[in-house]
From Swiss-Prot:
It is a peripheral membrane protein. Belongs to the ATPase alpha/beta chains family. One of its GO terms (molecular function) is ATP hydrolysis activity. The lineage of its organism: Bacteria, Pseudomonadati, Pseudomonadota, Alphaproteobacteria, Hyphomicrobiales. It comes from the Bacteria. This is ATP synthase subunit beta.
Amino acid sequence: MAQPANQVGRITQVIGAVVDVQFDGYLPAILNAIETTNQGHRLVLEVAQHLGESTVRAIAMDTTEGLVRGQEVTDTGAPIKVPVGEGTLGRIMNVVGEPVDEGGPVKADGTRAIHQEAPAYTEQSTEAEILVTGIKVVDLLAPYAKGGKIGLFGGAGVGKTVLIQELINNVAKAHGGYSVFAGVGERTREGNDLYHEFIESGVNKKGGGEGSKCALVYGQMNEPPGARARVGLTGLTVAEHFRDQGQDVLFFVDNIFRFTQAGSEVSALLGRIPSAVGYQPTLATDMGALQERITTTTKGSITSVQAIYVPADDLTDPAPATSFAHLDATTVLNRAISEKGIYPAVDPLDSTSRMLSPLVVGEEHYQTARMVQQVLQRYKSLQDIIAILGMDELSEEDKLTVARARKIERFLSQPFHVAEVFTGSPGKFVELADTIKGFKGLCEGKYDHLPEAAFYMVGTIEEAVEKGKKLAAEAA
């Protein structure tokens, strides 16, 4: 269908990912998708600002090398629309919904705009139910909510992606419903590994189609900032469609920080004055627009797990700090713990969850979690004394506390299924009842006779006892 002549504009300026387009007596709306061809490929741009009477400033969703001034650009009259529905399962799409897995066109139920309103208060659901992950430290100290929002915070190389992959392994594979994975500005290698891992484990069928359970939406590190700033919304749009059909959806995002980072790259090019630490002035608004849409309604639920990179291990940095307010549970990964060789390197005192209340998890679970935190907190406060004076200067009671705390620390570690290839030890899924039983026994002193090494990288407490016997036999 030919566009009306005035809906065709011409490029007047190209600055990196930002392109100015002049129309004649016509202005496309903000957030509209406008299209041109670049070296034989369709290039989509999103209108970000109106400059003067007939010029718009747009953000490119793909590379702008090869664009020239005077080139024609057409307004589509609507925001970016992406395919949604069961045809997306097992497929990899990019930010504008084009397949990138060489599997032919996506057979979708229809398309949906990536910019949507967040559900109204009256449509939201407030049920409290725990999502068991099989990871001891998470289930005990900062349990996840079904239909809640979960953030995994950590600096570079402390294990966020491995933890998110283990959650996909433990939760998505056992989960009957659909999952959506949004790769936002992370390594392409990891995205490729995940795609093949899903096919090998039977979550997806090669080339999509019947039996696939997870849709993948990628805008990785090599993409321009426009794609990285919008790919999270594309993934969310696919997840929202499943939710509105009455499904319980799992939505994984790796990494939310890259969404913020892309926004800050584009923000300067758009001429906005930067705010704290050079971030965009609209940081909280951008984050809110994404996070408020990730919610559970009366129709269906979205349980989201988001990895959030912490620049220079500083949790007060504006990017991670802005996302804290939106989450139901936070799992904080700590470099000091990973340096001890304890994986997952979750900080048991810094991680929080609104589900850790006796009304939700029950009295026994709550008391056990608090006992564990009490012992670990006491150990933390004694560490200065130990460093200066040594263990001998502690009272008998404190010596016992330290011994138990060190055992608890090691028992919080656990071998992962996704790390089997690196570690050689088989992964463990620990049921919640076994987790509570093990830590309760540890705090009550039932296992004071076992050596520390017996608790390292095991699943249940029975395995620790078994390992203790084995170590004793070897020593004898």
